[in-house]
Amino acid sequence: MNTILFQSANVLDVRSLQLKAGQDVWVENGLIKSVVPHQPDVFIASGTNVIKAQGKTLMPGLIDCHVHVIAAHLNLNVTANQPNVFATLRALPIMKGMLMRGFTTVRDAGGGDWNLAEATRTDMVEGPRIFASGRALSQTGGHGDGRPRSDVIEPCGCSS
């Protein structure tokens, strides 16, 4: 069993809307098991990872429901036309930055794929958990329509 004890952390109680100082937060196998006032004489099992958090505020991970982890450029044509390996390499610092800002889960709304999600899940790279939608859907002529503008009067070229 993987047990973590955050000792004496500040924790926001969302029911009372109070920031409670000196709380011990017990986590087992990735799940919060209890939040109790700090008890200096409490038994701590061997192998427990104890993190002294006095003066620090503990909060759950943030979730962003609309990201594009491969959007390293604001120019969508540059982003869409770059080789996949470049898109991946440019996504790595973006993903790590998301994690360092507290986002532990993101929904990629177009661009990032299952492979990037799997790379973070298996700790191959640092980043948030990614729920990838795959390719973006867009209306004709919208920002996701990668076709160039055309002034052709007969778009299909089939009339004589």
Regions found by a protein language model. Give the residues of each.
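Metal-associated gating/positioning segment near the N- to mid-region
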Residues: 56-122, 140-145
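Histidine-rich, glycine-flanked metal-binding segment
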Residues: 2, 11, 15-59
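Metal-coordinating catalytic core of metallo-dependent amide/deamination hydrolases
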Residues: 124-160
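A generic structural signal for alpha->beta connector loops
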Residues: 47, 103, 127-129
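Short secondary-structure capping/turn micro-motifs that flank functional sites
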Residues: 42, 114-115, 136
